[in-house]
């Protein structure tokens, strides 16, 4: 988002716009649902980043969650279209949890089992919850989340995680 704002600023300046006019435009931007959309309700903060996922974006989202206030909960699902190394790439994302201070992982999906196992090995500070399906995950997640928590929800779109965000925002 920052790089997009910088690129937009450069284009605006190239076309003779005033910096104050560009600033107003940038300040009025709102993130799209599923694309690092931050939702704050009376209970907790949800980072809705479940439109798509790949190893780089997963790691970046985990880094953002690590810097968030309160108890940090990562709700992650499978990453699609990774090819023959998909299991290793999921495990690599799990290894990224080491030293991040993430309190809990709720993972669902066949490939995310690799991610959950890697978190269990690399991050003793993270409570790991693995489920085969998104529905099983939601059943355990909803009563787990408390006031003041920050919850990252991220998976490839085919996993249907917007439903998780919808349940959390009820």
Predicted feature descriptions by range:
Residues 1:
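Short-chain dehydrogenase/reductase
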Residues 7-170:
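ATP-dependent carboxylate-amine ligase
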